[in-house]
Amino acid sequence: MSGLANSRLKEERRNFRKSRPFGFVAKPATLPDGSQDLMRWKCVVPGKEGTLFEGGVFAMTMVFDSDYPQSPPKCSFDLIDGKPLCHPNVYPSGKICLSIINPQGSDGGTWTPSTQIKVILLAIQTLLDEKEVNPLSPAQTDAYQLFTKDREAWRKRVREQVARVTPGGATGSASGGSGGPGGPIVLE
């Protein structure tokens, strides 16, 4: 890891801890030896109030390259019961399609090195709103087809997934109960 990436990620962690938006989590993953992996962060984005995603707690991962912050982190939602989040702008792998985390000149990317992790997470939360879906940039065929051809069926599927990732819901975790590779979701 470069010195710039290391110092920037440490600064991002300090800043996030000081001004963490309610319900959000962003912290380096824990390695088997107990140390922190600054290049891989486990995050939680709460569904925005007043949207279909309200009440959901969506686990995701941010992976940083050694040239961060020159390049954006790769952001992806954890799978929910082995399936991607039912959203037209989320790839089947869980990767999030959002201009703020795409390099400039790539797929309408608007990434700048000054973009903070907190801003990324808030933008991802905003994407979890039916009004913010970008049908011109479909990443997931099934979700796109439902969204454009049978909106009620799409809403039903979203509500089912939200129920799976709502604390106290069917599983209480975004990865089907186990919390995925990073363990259970723990809000700090």
Feature map (PLM): residue ranges:
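Domain-scale recognition of soluble eukaryotic interaction modules
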Residues: 2-19, 72-188
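Short, ligand-facing micro-motifs at secondary-structure edges
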Residues: 22-29, 85-86
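Conserved, non-catalytic sequence blocks in retroelement Pol enzymes and Pol-derived host proteins
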Residues: 29-35, 48-52, 108-115
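A general secondary-structure signal for short beta-strands and their flanking turns/coil
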Residues: 36-40, 55-57, 93
